[in-house]
């Protein structure tokens, strides 16, 4: 358990106490404890300061290892938690099996850029491990951030440096593995979407070997885009051999010029314009390309999007977008701005073919595509019926204050 390290002598406030730790990410200088996988002895040193003079005292503290329950097929919940939203966990969030702490980035020298994850966030996020929840570090490479990812994966030598730095970070901070969010290989080679598939395969293979050599319990996962195009940048059959799980990003599946669901479970075959792509379509593609169902994790979006349709018919669904633009909005905002005005200018719709909810705001002429308790229930049933690994959430901090969506996930994953 955590303990308090006092800053002043209890009987003499003129005596100051300063603390250092031989392993600050096992026991912090403030007494936060983050256990590892093995018993660890940490030396705490107290500096007693009075009248400009210092005296030092040291004591060894033994930290017992943490243990985790085995991840159960069709019962595993992964929750991404972005650093910019993290404050502390709710009771429901701690019922996730794995937290993907987001994000670290790749520096030009292939070290990890942890600037978004200060000590306050790290200690707070890693506290979940004491509740039996694994905490994995997610490394992002999106847009321009792809370049350093690309360079790091390019050669055997660059990969060795990159992987060594990753493993060092996992062991230093007591993470339980790594999640790769490289979006996307081939970003800087337009027209050659699969140009870095081999480098990606080599990276995941060598990283997996390095992690498992340190601890067979370490996880290696990857977020890979859903839909009909993004997967073409990856050799799915090969890379899936070296990944414990693949997080299928089954959201943002709308097309900007049309009024679509962004995270529908099924496509509407009879009305093909009702959705650009779906969870089922994406899962089918990944299985066809050689990914075992037991490694596929489908995404649940704790956010939605809105656009202005040209026509209000059927709430705008299936028509054209007036400005070919969607605006992203958290579920918390959807609940406050739109759902609070049901029957007061906002109409709720359920698309039973696509198993997706949507709203039409007649006051502002908005079509809103989002996730709710009913669509979460449908997705979890689909996941179980198809023998998939579980579900993942992007992103825990976008839920309502009352935890509407995480409660639905937990209830349906029991």
Give the ranges of each region predicted by the language model:
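Substrate-binding surface in catalytic domains of secreted glycosidases
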Residues: 108-120, 164, 185-336
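Glycan-binding loop/region signatures in secreted carbohydrate-active enzymes
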Residues: 139, 300-382, 409-414
């Amino acid at each position: 358990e955590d303990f308090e390290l006092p800053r002043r002598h209890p009987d003499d406030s003129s005596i100051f106490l300063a603390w250092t730790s031989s392993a600050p990410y096992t026991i912090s200088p403030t007494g936060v404890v983050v256990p590892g996988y093995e018993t660890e002895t940490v030396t705490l040193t107290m500096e007693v300061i009075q009248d400009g003079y210092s005296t030092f005292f040291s004591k060894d503290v033994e930290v017992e290892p943490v243990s985790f329950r085995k991840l159960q097929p069709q019962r595993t919940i992964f929750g991404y938690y972005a650093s910019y939203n993290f404050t502390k966990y709710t009771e429901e969030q701690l019922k996730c099996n794995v937290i993907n702490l987001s994000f670290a980035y790749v520096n030009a020298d292939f070290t990890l850029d942890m600037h978004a994850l200060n000590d306050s966030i790290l200690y707070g996020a890693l506290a979940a491990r004491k509740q039996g929840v694994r905490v994995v570090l997610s490394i992002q490479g999106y847009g321009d951030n792809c370049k350093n990812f690309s360079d790091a994966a390019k050669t055997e030598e660059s990969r060795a440096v990159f992987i060594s730095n990753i493993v060092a970070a996992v062991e230093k901070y007591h993470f339980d593995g790594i999640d790769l969010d490289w979006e996307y290989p081939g970003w800087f080679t337009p027209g050659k979407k699969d140009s870095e598939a081999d480098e990606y395969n080599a990276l995941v293979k060598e990283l997996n070997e390095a992690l498992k050599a340190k601890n067979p319990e370490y996880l290696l996962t990857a977020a890979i885009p859903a839909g009909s195009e993004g997967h073409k940048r990856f050799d799915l059959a090969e890379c899936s051999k070296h990944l414990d799980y693949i997080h299928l990003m089954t959201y943002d599946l709308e097309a900007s010029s049309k009024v679509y669901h962004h995270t529908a479970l099924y496509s509407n075959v009879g009305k093909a314009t009702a959705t650009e792509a779906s969870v089922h379509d994406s899962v089918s593609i990944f299985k066809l390309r050689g990914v075992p169902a037991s490694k596929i994790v489908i995404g649940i979006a704790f956010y939605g999007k809105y656009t202005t349709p040209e026509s209000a018919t059927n709430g705008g669904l299936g028509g054209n977008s007036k400005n070919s633009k969607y605006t992203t909005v958290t579920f918390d905002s959807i609940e406050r701005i739109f759902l609070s005005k049901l029957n007061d200018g906002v109409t709720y719709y359920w698309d039973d073919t696509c198993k997706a909810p949507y709203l039409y705001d007649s006051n502002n002429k908005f079509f809103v595509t989002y996730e709710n308790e009913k669509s979460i229930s449908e997705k979890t049933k689909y996941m179980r019926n198809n023998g998939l690994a579980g579900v993942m959430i992007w992103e825990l901090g976008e839920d309502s204050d009352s935890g509407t969506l995480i409660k639905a996930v937990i209830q349906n994953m029991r």
